[in-house]
Every structure is written in structure tokens, then in C-alpha cells.
């Protein structure tokens, strides 16, 4: 519940209106709920990356005309990666639907990943937006972007590169398939 409280307080700080708060908060809680549904269904044993993406992105994966393509080898994510990655992907999709490729009927998003199989296997995941509105120069990162950076770097012990290129957002997420850190507070201050 502390995570929900933290999501609420951070969302209220960055929402200009009550309807904006309500929609943003509901979306974040839905992403958290999807992650916990996955974990319950798998008895906290993890899930395939493709399945996680399909679950989180289901509102955008329309039968017969998907605007999001997913491509990569089978990857089993450990249970403790499910919530942070779900939250990060939700924020990418939300930002794409508000400001990026998914805000334009012609826009598309491609998500691809690979696994670097060295002594410490890690996932390299790319989110690339196409045919959306151009991103104005000097675009500032909002709270959603801050959340993406936090959950990937702190909770997954990974790294994030976000390129707000005029042609569309390019995101690179890299994280190990094992994590030694338990789910940290998602938003900077919540304990659970």
C-alpha cells in the first residue's frame, strides 16, 4: 500500500487538474494491478518478457492492426523484475499516447530486445516511436520519465537512455536478468 500512496502523492504533484490526476493515477494503478495479476498467476515465478509486454500494452495491441510490434527471443524475467518493468513500459506507452507516436493515427511503436549472454545475462530493450508528431527541441522530462529512470536504474539495477529525437522517442533499457535489490520504493520515499 505504501507504493500506491507514493504513486498517488507523486501523481497529485504533477497533475494540473483533478481529471488529469484521476486519469493518470488510474493508469498507474492499472499497470501495478496488471503486474500483480501476472505474479499471482505465475505464483511469483516470473514471466516471459513478451507476455509481460502484451499484458501491459494490451490497450494498444489492437487485433488485426497493432500499432505496436514486439520482437525478441524468449526471455524469462524473474518475479522481482515484473513490477518495475511493468511500470516503466506503462509510462512509455502513456507518454506515446499523449505526446508521441500513439497520439497520431499513423504512429507506430516497435519494441525489440535481445539478451547479452555473458557471465551476468542482461536484457537490451529498445522502444522506438515512428510517424508521430515531432518532438519539440528542449522537451523537458516529466514525472513519467523520472519514474522510468528510477525503476530501471534502482529497482532493476539497469540503465536507461532516452533520446527525444524530433523523429520520435528512442528509448534504450538495459537490465540484468537477476537483481539483488528488492523492489525499492517506486517514487522516492515509500517503504513496504
Feature names for model-found ranges:
Residues 133-161, 191:
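ATP phosphate-binding glycine-rich loop and adjacent ATP-lid/helix-beta elements
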Residues 62-108, 139:
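Conserved short strand/loop->alpha-helix "switch" segment adjacent to the catalytic nucleotide/phosphoryl-transfer site
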